């Protein structure tokens, strides 16, 4: 049985197009027997914003404040969740050409030297290996493979840095460029999702 972690990151609630696609994917994969865990980073599972105190605490050490200890424990939980699943599905709507702050915050909690990556004499090495990632990205305009897409290249870089190099991408483009473009973008994205195996 495939174990899947789904990360939602939209802040738009019931208006979220990425959530529609993620729910479609979850339903599709559940019929294939996948065990799915959902973390709604833009909703009920929003994380504390990583500030200087938290960032310092995530390095560990003996002299941690109570808050730092709590945030380190939260980070450990998120990392364990990441490592426990075979496939990581990331809902990544484009906000102002990049990812939502809530998703970036999750990255800041799990990208830890000595935990999810390390530095060697030949450069960095990811420690979260043998995983697969699926990015489901929605955007109001048409940005795929262009200079204004700071979503997919960035996420591929981060995932590769921690060891996840098997990355598939589902695009839903031009969703704010009229009803026909919206319907076409969502239909094509759902078709792409239907081709994915859990």
Swiss-Prot record:
Catalysed reactions listed for this entry: 2 a quinone + NADH + H(+) = 2 a 1,4-benzosemiquinone + NAD(+); N,N-dimethyl-1,4-phenylenediamine + anthranilate + 2 NAD(+) = 2-(4-dimethylaminophenyl)diazenylbenzoate + 2 NADH + 2 H(+)
Keywords on record: Flavoprotein, FMN, NAD, Oxidoreductase
Keyword NAD: yes
MF terms in GO: electron transfer activity; FMN binding; oxidoreductase activity, acting on NAD(P)H as acceptor; oxidoreductase activity, acting on NAD(P)H, quinone or similar compound as acceptor
InterPro entries attached to this UniProt entry: Flavodoxin_fold, Flavoprotein-like_sf, FMN-dep_NADH:Q_OxRdtase_AzoR1, NADH:quinone_OxRdtase_FMN_depd
Record note on cofactor: Binds 1 FMN per subunit.
SUPFAM superfamilies the UniProt entry points to: Flavoproteins
Assigned EC number: 1.6.5.-, 1.7.1.17
Cofactor: FMN
Keyword NAD included in the entry's annotation: yes
Protein purpose: Quinone reductase that provides resistance to thiol-specific stress caused by electrophilic quinones. Also exhibits azoreductase activity. Catalyzes the reductive cleavage of the azo bond in aromatic azo compounds to the corresponding amines.
Subunit: Homodimer.
Name the UniProt record assigns to this protein: FMN-dependent NADH:quinone oxidoreductase
Name of encoding gene: azoR
């Amino acid at each position: 049985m495939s174990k899947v972690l789904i990360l939602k990151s939209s802040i738009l609630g019931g208006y979220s197009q990425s959530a529609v696609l993620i729910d479609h994917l979850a339903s599709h994969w559940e019929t294939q027997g996948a065990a799915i865990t959902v973390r709604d980073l833009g909703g009920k599972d929003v994380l504390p914003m990583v500030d200087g105190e938290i960032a310092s605490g995530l390095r560990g050490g003996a002299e941690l404040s109570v808050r730092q200890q709590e945030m380190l424990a939260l980070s450990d939980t998120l990392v364990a969740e990441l490592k426990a699943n075979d496939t990581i599905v990331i809902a990544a709507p484009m906000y102002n050409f990049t990812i939502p702050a809530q998703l970036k915050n999750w990255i800041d909690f799990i990208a830890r030297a000595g935990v999810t990556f390390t530095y060697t004499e030949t450069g960095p090495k990811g420690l979260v290996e043998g995983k697969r990632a699926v990015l489901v990205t929605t955007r109001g305009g048409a940005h795929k493979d262009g200079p204004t897409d700071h979503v997919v290249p960035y996420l591929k870089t981060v995932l590769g840095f921690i060891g996840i190099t098997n990355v598939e991408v589902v695009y839903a483009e031009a969703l704010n460029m009229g009803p026909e473009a919206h319907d076409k973008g969502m239909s094509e994205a759902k078709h792409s999702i239907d081709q994915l195996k859990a």
